[in-house]
Amino acid sequence: MNLNEFQQKYAYRKEINYDGQIDLLARVVMEQKERYILQTINGFKPAVVKGKMRHEAISREDYPAVGDWVVLQEKDFNDIVIIDQVLPRFSSIVRKVAGLRTDAQIVASNVTKVFIVISADEDLNERKLERYLTAVWESGASPHIVFSKVDLASDMDSIIEHADSIAFGIPLYKWNATNEEGKEDILANIHEDDSVVLIGSSGAGKSTLINALLTEKVLKTGSVREDDKRGRHTTTHRELFNLPTGGVIIDTPGMRELQLWTEDGDTLSHTFSDINHLIAECKFTDCKHDTEPDCAVKEALETGDLEEGRWNSYLKLQRELAYIERKQNAKLATEERKKWKKISMQQKKNR
């Protein structure tokens, strides 16, 4: 495989901006408990991170993730290559880790499009979709929505209508696994320089869709429990695949929950652009949308132009992001103190 073939096959983009030795460039295609499989110009290689990277890592974001482009050390260790550096990411799907810890988990990096896979055989959970869209817009990638199991939907037109009222022009696809109807529409929107990740709940059909797009069964698929419609986890790790039509696609384990993560204060602006527009029309710039006169938000709620459930969802996500930001700031301050304490102790040793 020459340089052009390697870069084209693994959706290398100019944003990566690497000008070093090409045989030291690799893309992470699989991650399992700090063990990695990389695609290099010379084929697949097992890998680990170098000790210095592990020692200096402050959070999980400092470790490689599926989709990352990495630079290798020149010498390997018993045929295991050593990851020396993670190149800057131009996008990343990030969520807060489950539980009380304020830590980020990278679902996939350097992706151009995110396909949110939703099962059409049950009622559309609008609040969950808003949460997914918020995470995708925050990532720097563009969101797409795929409705799976459309042959089992009781009212597909209603589902599309509801989704469109939230998605505001985001591409929507209908996918039928029994006859693969809709597959060509999806492939037509994945280009050779695209890196696409699929996210969604367990049992939504992500692995089945990837098998269809790859034209071969590379992923195990599972059934859905009839009592609660929850899928069984068939994908246990993240993995990147080449599409025969060009581009790469990343499978991810099903998500029971998606807790948001933020890097700035403008996270909700895309998902709730309608609410942002209303807020801009309020008489007072610091309107709390409570007792103030000439409040466009209150007026829209009263007339029904703004659904109360959507407004409450906006407020809930706003509170969640504010809480995470406060915790992040506290954590950063603690880490900064630890770092300088460590530097001070090292300086004393060197005297």
From Swiss-Prot:
Keywords: Cytoplasm, GTP-binding, Hydrolase, Metal-binding, Nucleotide-binding, Ribosome biogenesis, RNA-binding, rRNA-binding, Zinc. PROSITE patterns: ENGC_GTPASE, G_CP. GO terms for molecular function: GTP binding; GTPase activity; metal ion binding; rRNA binding. It comes from the Bacteria. GTP binds at residues 148-151, 200-208. One of its GO terms (biological process) is ribosomal small subunit biogenesis. The keyword Secreted does not apply. Its cofactor is Zn(2+). One of its GO terms (cellular component) is cytoplasm. It is found in: Cytoplasm. Zn(2+) binds at residues 282, 287, 289, 295. Binds 1 zinc ion per subunit. Its EC number is 3.6.1.-. Residues 100-258 form the CP-type G domain. It is an enzyme of class 3 (hydrolase). It holds the Pfam family RsgA_GTPase. Belongs to the TRAFAC class YlqF/YawG GTPase family. RsgA subfamily. Monomer. Associates with 30S ribosomal subunit, binds 16S rRNA. One of several proteins that assist in the late maturation steps of the functional core of the 30S ribosomal subunit. Helps release RbfA from mature subunits. May play a role in the assembly of ribosomal proteins into the subunit. Circularly permuted GTPase that catalyzes slow GTP hydrolysis, GTPase activity is stimulated by the 30S ribosomal subunit. This is Small ribosomal subunit biogenesis GTPase RsgA 1. It comes from Oceanobacillus iheyensis (strain DSM 14371 / CIP 107618 / JCM 11309 / KCTC 3954 / HTE831).
